[in-house]
From Swiss-Prot:
It is a single-pass membrane protein. GO terms for biological process: mitochondrial electron transport, ubiquinol to cytochrome c. Belongs to the UQCR10/QCR9 family. One of its GO terms (cellular component) is mitochondrial inner membrane. The chain crosses the membrane at residues 28-53. It is found in: Mitochondrion inner membrane. The lineage of its organism: Eukaryota, Viridiplantae, Streptophyta, Embryophyta, Tracheophyta. Component of the ubiquinol-cytochrome c oxidoreductase, a multisubunit transmembrane complex that is part of the mitochondrial electron transport chain which drives oxidative phosphorylation. Keywords: Electron transport, Membrane, Mitochondrion, Mitochondrion inner membrane, Respiratory chain, Transmembrane, Transmembrane helix, Transport. Its main location: mitochondrion. The keyword Kinase does not apply. This is Cytochrome b-c1 complex subunit 9. Component of the ubiquinol-cytochrome c oxidoreductase (cytochrome b-c1 complex, complex III, CIII), a multisubunit enzyme composed of 3 respiratory subunits cytochrome b, cytochrome c1 and Rieske protein, 2 core protein subunits, and additional low-molecular weight protein subunits. The complex exists as an obligatory dimer and forms supercomplexes (SCs) in the inner mitochondrial membrane with cytochrome c oxidase (complex IV, CIV).
Amino acid sequence: MESAARRSGGGVLEGFYRLVMRRTPVYVTFVIAGALLGERAVDYGVKTLWEKNNVGKRYEDISVLGQRPVDE
């Protein structure tokens, strides 16, 4: 009796299962896309944090480096 009630009720997890995890190619695509998006998000966050913590210490911030002395 409970299983019949569960089947008709649905739910978020059951909808997710039907949409993503029921077929292997869709599941693999979902996992690969999630990994790529997650990697980009982590990379962006770490890069932003690194740049904020190292303002003035980076090569790009030092204006004298890479310039030739002017002969007068």
